Curated annotation (Swiss-Prot):
Primary localization class, coarse: membrane
Family: Belongs to the FliP/MopC/SpaP family.
InterPro entries, per the entry: FliP, T3SS_IM_P
Top-level taxon: Bacteria
Pfam families given in the database record: FliP (PF00813)
Name of the protein described by the UniProt record: Flagellar biosynthetic protein FliP
Keywords: Bacterial flagellum, Bacterial flagellum biogenesis, Bacterial flagellum protein export, Cell membrane, Membrane, Protein transport, Transmembrane, Transmembrane helix, Transport
Amino acid sequence: MRKCFNFFLFFSVTSLSFAQTKSLQTTNGLNFPFLNFDSIGGSEIAFSLQLLILLTIITLSPAFLVLMTSFLRISIVLDFIRRALSLQQSPPTQIVMGLALFLTIFTMWPTFNSIYEQAYLPLKESKINFNEFYNKGIAPLRIFMYKQMSDGRHEEIRLFMSMSNYDRPKNFSEVPTHVLIAAFILHELKVAFKMGILIFLPFIVLDIIVASVLMAMGMIMLPPVMISLPFKLILFVMVDGWTLITSGLIKSFM
């Protein structure tokens, strides 16, 4: 858990190194009307800007972690399961998100461990500076994101490279990080929806069968969902659905 906490602070710590340079450059030559920065002092302004940027990064870091890890795919697939079973409130959203979080930690643990050993520990022992810390820390995440897209033709990377007016990269290292993140998010959405459709199919067939039987019996006013719900739950329990879904999600990242 300590490693996960250190990884959570990875984005905020790295931003501080860039904030120091940017804030010092910004305070030189500020000329706002009705404001006299000379009486305040450049160091105080720089510290205030650093604090503002640091708090902003800490606020946005959960969103970055959600989009750059396996949480995106896992959370969408688990939500598809609940909708396929026609269950609106069971299991509760908090439990679904908690399960997605712990599955994310399980699948991302090798990546988190690499960041901890290659970036955080050397920085803690003052063996590397902040720039080296950022490069060593982002490398395992880049490898993880690229590995998830290695099963296709890298259409997402080509799309965002062309939209950014970049030349075609010769290898993985030439892909900018912001392009890789955008491509990874799009790829995860596509994979999650494909998995969700496969989960939906057997339950849709069951709904169609129940609706056809009700129409044949003349029970048109009775909602088919009410009748098919118990059969969906029985089918899901008999095939050990949670184990199949969990193992399938974990194997999809290997």
